[in-house]
């Protein structure tokens, strides 16, 4: 079926601090605001990031206006209900914006990510001794301003097909939580300096189970294949094939684990398996794809974590398509 109803899902403009306004010559200089950035190179960098992001949004809107499609635009912070009645969602920002969009999508509506402000390697090299000049991460974004119309046309005419990516399902005390994670989840104490106390075991749908592992650690991270290149990889995990339907889990900074438990502190959750967690702190949290979506947990709560979740259809960049299975 032709894709003729499009939702443009955009990162807000005002995500960076504004440049201080110049005071009139006759006015005394105002006191500097607390923690205001004053390095002119940093200010120019932030200004340029806003400019490039706005230009990309305007370009996307201009391209859509030339197509025989119905479309609307919404800022990501204004979205609170599931997305229905569209054939395609276009996220404009970076991976974070695509992840936010995914939380409102079922398995039927594809999403195309546009990296609105890609990192410029020469800029990073030039400024690396002064500040971090990296820009937007777009690992899952198939398009930039340079190729947006080409990728959009291929998507609209069906020559560019979406890939089906696994997501993470979490049940709390047997009840399904409404958010499905596209990247990863983190189960931990809400204070990063506190120890997370919990037990877990891997269990299959046929009833087979690992032995119980009692943990004191910094928490439990579970990643999808799409999320295996993010925090999981930074923590010592491995990159998974993007088309895999397995999950990768890791206990973060385990405290004095038993030798018998060590082989199970990092591994895979295959299809037909889940991780069963019992939480033993007074308070805790499950974070979905970063810090924006969080569900509180308390002592005695159980979590069932698996890939038994609706897939997400994503138009992937060529390098991920070539990764294969």
Swiss-Prot record:
Q: What is its EC number?
A: 2.7.1.86
What superkingdom heads the lineage? Eukaryota
Oligomeric form and interacting partners: Homodimer.
Keywords, comma-separated and alphabetical: ATP-binding, Cytoplasm, Kinase, NAD, NADP, Nucleotide-binding, Transferase
Stored SUPFAM superfamilies? NAD kinase/diacylglycerol kinase-like
Per its UniProt entry, what is the enzyme's top EC class, as one word?
A: transferase
Write out the similarity annotation: Belongs to the NAD kinase family.
Organism field: Oryza sativa subsp. japonica
Job of this protein: Key source of the cellular reductant NADPH which is an important antioxidant factor.
Coiled coil (residue ranges):
none
Entry's Gene Ontology cellular component terms: cytoplasm
GO biological process entries: NAD metabolic process; NADP biosynthetic process
Give any GO molecular function from the UniProt entry: NAD+ kinase activity
Q: Subcellular location, in the record's words?
A: Cytoplasm
* Catalytic activity entry: NADH + ATP = ADP + NADPH + H(+)
What name goes with this protein?
A: Probable NADH kinase
- Where does the UniProt entry say this protein principally localizes? cytoplasm
């Amino acid at each position: 079926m032709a894709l003729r109803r499009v939702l443009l899902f955009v990162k807000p403009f005002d995500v960076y601090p504004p440049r201080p306004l110049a005071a009139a010559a006759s006015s005394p200089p105002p006191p500097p605001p607390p923690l205001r950035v004053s390095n002119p190179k940093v200010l120019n960098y932030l200004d340029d990031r806003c400019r490039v992001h706005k230009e990309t949004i305007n370009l996307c809107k201009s391209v859509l206006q030339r197509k025989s499609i119905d479309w609307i635009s919404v800022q990501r912070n204004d979205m609170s209900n599931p997305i229905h009645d569209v054939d395609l969602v276009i996220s404009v920002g970076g991976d974070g914006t695509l992840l936010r969009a995914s939380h409102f999508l079922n398995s039927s509506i594809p999403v195309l990510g546009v990296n609105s402000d890609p990192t410029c390697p020469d800029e990073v090299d030039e400024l690396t001794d002064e500040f971090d000049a990296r820009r937007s991460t777009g690992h899952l974004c198939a398009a930039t301003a340079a190729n947006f119309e080409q990728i959009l046309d291929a998507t609209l005419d069906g020559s560019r097909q979406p890939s089906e990516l696994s997501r993470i399902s979490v049940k709390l005390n047997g009840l399904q939580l409404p958010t499905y994670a596209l990247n990863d989840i983190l189960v931990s104490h809400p204070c990063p300096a506190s120890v997370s106390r919990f037990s877990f075991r891997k269990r299959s749908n046929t009833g087979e189970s690992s032995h119980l592992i009692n943990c004191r650690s910094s928490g439990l991270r579970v990643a999808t294949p799409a999320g295996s290149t993010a925090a999981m990889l930074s923590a010592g995990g491995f990159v998974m094939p993007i088309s895999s339907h397995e999950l990768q889990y890791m206990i973060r900074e385990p405290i004095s684990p038993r030798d018998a438990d060590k082989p199970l502190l990092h591994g895979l959750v295959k299809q037909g398996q889940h991780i069963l967690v019992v939480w033993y702190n007074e308070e805790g949290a499950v974070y979905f794809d970063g810090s924006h979506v969080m569900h509180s947990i308390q002592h005695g709560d159980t979590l069932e974590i698996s890939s038994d979740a609706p897939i997400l259809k994503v138009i992937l960049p060529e390098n991920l398509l070539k990764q294969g299975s």
